[in-house]
Amino acid sequence: MRAYERLLKYAKVYTTSDPESGTHPSAAREFDLAHLLVEEMKSIGIEDAFVGEHCYVYGNIPATKGCEKKPALGLIAHMDTAPDAPGENVKPILHENYDGGDVTLPGTGMVMKTSTFPFLKELKGETLITTDGTTLLGADDKSGVAEILTAAETLIKKKLPHGKLCIAFTPDEEIGEGASLFDIPGFGADFAYTVDGGDVGGIEYENFNAASATVTIHGFSVHPGSAKDAMINASNVAMEFHMALPVMARPETTEGYQGFYHLCQMYGDVTEAKLGYILRDHDASKLQFKKDNLLHIACYLNGKYGPGTVEVEIKDSYRNMLEKIKPHFHLVETARKAIEKAGLTPEEIPVRGGTDGAVLSWKGLPCPNLGTGGFNFHGVCECTTVERMDKATEILLNIVELYSK
């Protein structure tokens, strides 16, 4: 079975994670795909495959004769899809011999324009996979799951030489919980790759340092007819707080290594208002500056409106994996060779986000990220191609081969 065929099957299983649940996994529906994968893994020869109580799927392929002393390599992908767009009743559509032009998604009439998505022109002649426009596709990261299992099936069927291969599929990556209960000792790998990136040929070993902040503003309500010099409108103070942050440090005004403050949520009335932010920067010192800046703004507003008017709660989320990858840079060098062997040019760009691998790297499992061949994640214009998924699978096989020598 080719990787895209697996993706078409997995995409139809509803696995959107739930950021509000507070449970592990965040949604019981994630077990539906987990059980399907365990069954499939056993059918291709991964005899010890199982899913644990928190919806982590694990399985191992023992080393072939003569490769027992080679390092144990891990491959990891996540099963959940992002809650940013609908993920139920996904209807994948194959556009064979795609002409490189605008694509109309029939479920909504939405048009994926090449002027908006210039990369589409580069996909001309390939078999493009989209949805009907009513849901996301789930290529993030069911394409990674599909590519790992297709590579595993190839290794077993063709009896290719390899060291121990450790496979894991995680829940809740999209809500930042994918690595929280990952069993690194039980997984058994010396190092690993997550297969959760964008276009095929990508290698990601730098990511944001991340934090979140909740700003709570306590107002004082007075009848508006007699409010002069008495009312403190929490919603107005919230707007004042937000406008004190730099306009040019927002997601929509930054790129590359530029960090940002992102206002994700806001609500309020006269009595109370709340602002929810995520803070991101590749440089840990610059992230600390952003955290300090929020506190300084709160201090200023408390001086203006009274102590306790503004409260800021900051939580660290994940850290840049680069520091933990540098001592194991063979992972990057091997990935480069594997990509070149597949006839592609490696592309190494900083991740403007995070991966399970970033958290796992800091927990002791060095884990850069590889491209899957997908585009436009987290939205209804998400897409991939048959050919790029095949290439991603080939790259995984090349990595396994290189570590077996």
For each feature predicted by the language model, list its residue ranges.
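Metal-dependent amide/peptide-bond hydrolase catalytic core
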Residues: 235-405
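Active-site metal-coordination/substrate-binding segment of hydrolases
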Residues: 67-161, 169, 189
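A non-catalytic alpha/beta surface segment that caps or lines the substrate-entry region
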Residues: 22-70, 74-76, 80, 91
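Midchain, well-structured core segments that form catalytic/ion-binding scaffolds
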Residues: 111, 117-120, 126-139, 172-299, ...
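N-terminal capping segment at the start of a domain
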Residues: 2-28, 129-130, 318, 378-379
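Short beta-strand segments
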Residues: 74-78, 168-170, 193-196, 216, ...
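Short, conserved micro-motifs enriched in small and acidic residues
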Residues: 28, 135-146, 228-236, 383-390
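Phosphate-handling active-site elements
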Residues: 153-166, 247-254, 405
